[in-house]
Amino acid sequence: MKANTKSKKVNKAWLHDHVNDTYVKLAQKEGYRARAAYKLKEIDETLGLIRPGQVVVDLGSAPGAWSQYLRRRMAPAGAAAGQLNGTLIALDILPMEPIEGVTFLQGDFREEDVLARLQEAVQARPVDVVVSDMAPNLSGVESVDAVRIAHLIELAVDFAQQHLKPDGALVVKLFHGSGYAQLVQLFKEHFRTVKPMKPKASRDKSSETFLVGMGLRK
């Protein structure tokens, strides 16, 4: 009974924080599906990754906030609402409500047939930017979760190696903890410039952080 009461208190505290969160309110005001849009926005504004005319792949895209931000950034200056200059391909294991101009594929990025569908959608075009907000279902066992997270990031790096332009960029979400240093090293082996970033929209209590790799090593 006590445990149940504690759980209710935790849920109530989370709900209070969520409802009063600056980025939640901003997302509602600006029409984003989730506050996560502002994490990518800060990374992009800091590093200047996204421009009209690019080919961009959004991995782990549901519910679609990152794709919404990317779509807005890729619209040409002065364009009518909804106009997109470039190619934006999104993929997630979960369904995602349609976004005008975005090609969405539903499937598990870890499965070969899904990866083949993604490669077909790219159509051998060099990709400018790959962004990944993918995260596995967490078990709560740090060693197990670290392996699952690392696997997804390694797959994203492999995809980037195959499809990015030489000066392209890869953005991935990861977590401080077991395996973090090894993933930073993996990025350093494959990219000329590596920048760890924790956007302001990432909650202070969260171990969530992001790695950005820019410029493929030959």
UniProtKB/Swiss-Prot annotation:
- State which Enzyme Commission number(s) the record gives: 2.1.1.166
The UniProt entry lists the main location of this chain as cytoplasm
Q: One Pfam family of this protein, by short name?
A: FtsJ
Record-level Gene Ontology MF annotations: rRNA (uridine-2'-O-)-methyltransferase activity
Where is it located?
A: Cytoplasm
Keyword rRNA processing in annotation: yes
- Report the GO terms under cellular component: cytoplasm
Identify which top EC class this enzyme belongs to: transferase
Keywords on record:
Cytoplasm, Methyltransferase, rRNA processing, S-adenosyl-L-methionine, Transferase
**Which sites are catalytic?**
K173
Which sites bind S-adenosyl-L-methionine? G64, W66, D92, D108, D133
> What chemistry does it catalyse, as a reaction equation?
uridine(2552) in 23S rRNA + S-adenosyl-L-methionine = 2'-O-methyluridine(2552) in 23S rRNA + S-adenosyl-L-homocysteine + H(+)
Query: Which PANTHER family did the record assign?
Result: RIBOSOMAL RNA METHYLTRANSFERASE (PTHR10920), RRNA METHYLTRANSFERASE 2, MITOCHONDRIAL (PTHR10920:SF18)
Give the function comment from the record: Specifically methylates the uridine in position 2552 of 23S rRNA at the 2'-O position of the ribose in the fully assembled 50S ribosomal subunit.
Say which family it is in. Belongs to the class I-like SAM-binding methyltransferase superfamily. RNA methyltransferase RlmE family.
Mind telling me which HAMAP family this protein's record contains?
RNA_methyltr_E (MF_01547)
Q: What is this protein called?
A: Ribosomal RNA large subunit methyltransferase E
Tell me the organism: Paracidovorax citrulli (strain AAC00-1)
Q: What is the lineage of its organism?
A: Bacteria, Pseudomonadati, Pseudomonadota, Betaproteobacteria, Burkholderiales
Q: What would be the name of the gene that encodes this protein?
A: rlmE
